[in-house]
A protein has these predicted regions:
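Catalytic loop of the DD-peptidase/beta-lactamase superfamily, centered on the K-T-G motif
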Residues: 2-6, 14-69, 73-77, 256-369
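Short active-site loop at a secondary-structure junction
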Residues: 59-61, 85-140, 178-187, 262-265, ...
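Short alpha-helical hairpin
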Residues: 68-83, 159-168, 246
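Solvent-exposed coil/turn segments that connect beta secondary-structure elements
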Residues: 70-72, 84, 146-147, 231, ...
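Hydrophobic (often cysteine-bearing) scaffold residues that line and stabilize catalytic clefts
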Residues: 96, 100, 104, 191, ...
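Short, surface-exposed loop or secondary-structure junction motifs
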Residues: 136-316, 320-322
């Protein structure tokens, strides 16, 4: 009996070793996350390893970048300093700026799922005093073809409530009926501020509460927090504007300015956390498959849909964020399985060199099967 047991154990060991060798031949090995615990699994893929460094190091990159294939990190590149004393890490968090809009869109669709909102609802149902509100739908706010526009406002002080922000929007936003009628697209962040105000109105909760409940708790995100959080729990980077002569100027926006970015750019996230969240929105894990398609899938020749642009050759979704010394980029397949995520805490004045490198890399990486 013992002889058979030993033989069986020996066969199992042989199978395990053989499987491990096959994995090595394929170039994929699991990486331990004991030092830098990330939201998604990391593996070493010899085919992809080094691509990010080769491309981004030429830009004097300061930040964190990851390549995703089959929902796993297959390459990463970290460079530069997060603060005056700390280096950037894979778990460092960065202000994601406009990359937050796709997340706000997800919060809107979550309320549609709950029956509290319809994409066809007119805005005057919630904010009757907003110019043009009786002509604009929730869907048009999401896709930025509402006919609304608003110049960038300057704020002082350390506090700004949602009610005060809404008053500023109502007093300063402009509605162009001809633009609305033509369906012309115009990038106007105020659309997402209005959506965020509507979310707070219909739920009785703050935007932050909705974000925490829908995303952070559900997906167990550990490296995600708001810019105005008093108790900073993540390895947060400072944002620097880099001048042509190389001088770095640390950015420190006042509290009112941070609060004015409601739903459009007030969240800090690590690159792995951000990928996990956006992929979970696109693949239906958070919203359901049908709702995710209805919200995000581009229609016809439309380039912008609920916070994401569309690249056609090859086909993938993307977004860019700039502000307060940060520059962020995401390029992701529609099913969320492949992605390029690049977060930097160096915003170089008058230079889009980092974006060009990200685009070049993404076209190759996302363009093959």
């Amino acid at each position: 009996m013992k002889k058979w047991i030993y033989t069986f154990i020996g066969i199992l060991m042989f199978i395990c070793i053989a499987c491990y060798i096959v994995t090595l031949k394929k170039g994929d090995t699991v990486v331990s996350n004991t030092k830098t615990k990330t939201a998604i699994t990391r593996i070493v893929d010899r085919k992809e390893s080094g691509k990010l460094k080769k491309s981004l190091s030429k830009t004097k990159f300061s930040g964190t970048a990851v390549l995703i294939k089959n929902n796993k990190i297959v390459d990463s590149y970290v460079s530069g300093s997060a603060t005056d004393v700390d280096k950037n890490m894979l778990t460092t968090t960065y202000e994601i700026d406009s990359l937050q809009k796709v997340l706000t869109a997800g919060l809107v669709m979550n309320q549609v799922n709950k029956g509290k909102l319809k994409l066809t609802d007119r805005v005057n149902k919630f904010i009757p005093d907003l110019p043009g509100s009786k002509y604009i739908t929730i869907r048009e706010l999401l896709d930025m073809n509402s006919g609304l526009s608003m110049k960038k406002m300057k704020f002082s002080g350390n506090n700004l409530s949602s009610a005060e922000l809404l008053d500023v929007v109502i007093d300063n936003v402009r509605f162009d009926a001809n633009t609305k009628k033509s369906g012309k697209w115009s990038y106007q962040p105020v659309n997402f501020v209005i959506l965020s105000e509507i979310l707070e109105e219909i739920t009785g909760k703050s935007y932050k509460q909705l974000f925490d409940e829908t995303y952070i708790k559900k997906l167990k995100l550990k490296q995600t927090e708001f810019a105005y959080d008093n108790n900073i729990k993540t390895n947060r980077a400072y944002g620097y504007v880099v001048k042509g002569n190389g001088d770095r100027i640390k950015q420190n926006p006042n509290g009112a300015t941070v609060f004015s970015e409601l739903g459009t750019g007030q969240v800090y996230m690590s690159a792995p956390d951000y990928y996990k969240l956006v992929a979970s929105l696109l693949n239906g894990k958070v919203l359901g498959t049908d709702a995710a398609k209805e919200l995000y899938l581009p229609l016809g020749n439309g380039k912008y849909r609920a916070g994401l642009y569309t690249s056609k050759k090859p086909f993938y979704r993307y977004a860019n964020g700039y502000g307060y010394g940060f520059e962020s980029h995401v390029r992701i397949s529609q099913d969320g399985k492949k992605a390029v995520v690049v977060f930097s805490n160096h915003q170089v004045s008058g230079n889009n060199g980092l974006k060009k490198k990200v685009d070049q890399l993404s076209k190759k990486f996302l363009g093959y099967k």
